[in-house]
Amino acid sequence: MDLTELRGQIDEIDSSIVDLYEKRMDISRQVAEYKIENGKQVFDKAREEEKIRKVKSQTHNEFNSHGVEELFEQIMSMSR
């Protein structure tokens, strides 16, 4: 496989990530609206900590685990 093909695969993955990110943000907005309407706090530290543990457990090495932790901390911060 050459560099162009590898970059093409990365481009496809990146497009999927963008689509999934936008879907996640829309659902997060709905969750926040629900919480506000029902008098709940939007920020749920326990839920975020559990989410971080779960996604880190899905990785295959320490490097990816650290990257996924940073990624999801950022995603969750932006979706509050």
Task: List the model feature ranges, each with a label.
Residues 1-80:
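Domain-level signature for soluble enzymes in the chorismate/prephenate branch of the shikimate pathway
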